[in-house]
From Swiss-Prot:
Amino acid composition bias (Basic and acidic residues), ranges on this chain: 187-199, 221-233
Role, per record: Involved in diverse cellular processes such as ribosome biogenesis, centrosome duplication, protein chaperoning, histone assembly, cell proliferation, and regulation of tumor suppressors p53/TP53 and ARF. Binds ribosome presumably to drive ribosome nuclear export. Associated with nucleolar ribonucleoprotein structures and bind single-stranded nucleic acids. Acts as a chaperonin for the core histones H3, H2B and H4. Stimulates APEX1 endonuclease activity on apurinic/apyrimidinic (AP) double-stranded DNA but inhibits APEX1 endonuclease activity on AP single-stranded RNA.
Site of covalent link Glycyl lysine isopeptide (Lys-Gly) (interchain with G-Cter in SUMO): 228, 261
Positions carrying Phosphoserine: 4, 10, 43, 70, 125, 139, 225, 240-241, 252, 258
Region annotated Necessary for interaction with APEX1, chain positions: 1-117
Name of the coding gene: Npm1
Residues the record lists as Phosphothreonine modifications: 75, 95, 198, 217, 232, 235, 277
Annotated stretches, region: Disordered: 138-248
Keyword Acetylation: yes
Region (Required for nucleolar localization): 241-292
Organism: Mus musculus (Mouse)
Name of this protein: Nucleophosmin
SUPFAM superfamilies for this protein: Nucleoplasmin-like core domain (SSF69203)
Cross-referenced Pfam families: NPM1-C (PF16276), Nucleoplasmin (PF03066)
Length: 292
């Protein structure tokens, strides 16, 4: 039922930590966690007799809370050195707080397993990963074979043509200085026309060579669109409202699910599933839960 609620929220990233403890006749082990927003699970793997254990009956017991919030004791393993020195539990998961004790025997008994912590994924890191993927995709398109070398060649040839035209204009101006003032005024008019005709000549030369400057425009548009994407980061989703949470819980109950009946477990459930930290809203949800 909790898994169905988590589908609407941000994904949980599990973190695994090694766990181990030693039990003796007068030495119990208490497993507790701080009251944080993360969900903790104790997954027990193996129970085995330690070196120096006597060939006698050893009974390992675990004490935790059941679904109703009441304490319950469960026998995990029964060991004897000459018959069964070790038992594999295969991932026996318990929600803390948990007390592990040696109910019978002198020990030592070793218990190993994993401490599982469910941590919420950071929404900002996901957005950064998506932007990195888009950046790689755009850079791959720009570096297509045979496509990126055409524009620089066109620019080089156009620059050479402009330099040739500038040299011709300078030669014409030098010739005009040597002539009379009347001829100077007459010669300036065609020089200006030649300068004005330069773009047309360049366009004709580029058209004769079968080349055009238009392919350079999509690249600038792609850069502008990428800059717009960097300026508008996505905002992470906030916690759900009280009415939305009630609606989701009611829908879960109608589908056959159930809600925790103990206040402490219900509060922990609301914090983990809906990221709700407002104490007044949590109490409102608890009063609504008791009225069902």
């Amino acid at each position: 039922m909790e898994d169905s609620m988590d589908m609407d929220m941000s994904p949980l990233r599990p973190q695994n930590y090694l766990f181990g403890c030693e039990l003796k006749a007068d030495k119990d082990y208490h497993f507790k966690v701080d009251n944080d927003e993360n969900e903790h699970q104790l997954s027990l793997r193996t129970v085995s007799l330690g070196a120096g254990a006597k060939d006698e009956l050893h009974i390992v017991e675990a004490e935790a809370m059941n679904y109703e919030g009441s304490p319950i004791k469960v026998t995990l393993a029964t060991l004897k050195m000459s018959v069964q020195p070790t038992v594999s539990l295969g991932g026996f998961e318990i929600t803390p707080p948990v007390v592990l004790r040696l109910k019978c025997g002198s020990g030592p008994v070793h218990i190993s397993g994993q401490h599982l912590v469910a941590v919420e994924e950071d929404a900002e890191s996901e957005d950064e990963d998506e932007e990195d993927v888009k950046l790689l995709g755009m850079s791959g398109k720009r570096s297509a074979p045979g496509g990126g070398n055409k524009v620089p060649q066109k620019k080089v040839k156009l620059d050479e043509d402009d330099e040739d035209d500038d040299e011709d204009d300078e030669d014409d101006e030098d010739d005009d200085d040597d002539d009379f003032d009347e001829e100077e005024t007459e010669e300036k008019v065609p020089v200006k026309k030649s300068v004005r005709d330069t773009p047309a000549k360049n366009a004709q030369k580029s058209n004769q060579n079968g080349k055009d400057l238009k392919p350079s425009t999509p690249r600038s548009k792609g850069q502008e669109s990428f800059k717009k994407q960097e300026k508008t980061p996505k905002t992470p989703k906030g916690p759900s409202s009280v009415e939305d949470i009630k609606a989701k819980m009611q829908a879960s109950i109608e589908k056959g699910g159930s809600l925790p009946k103990v206040e402490a477990k219900f509060i922990n459930y609301v914090k983990n599933c809906f990221r709700m930290t407002d104490q007044e809203a949590i109490q409102d949800l608890w009063q609504w839960r008791k009225s069902l």
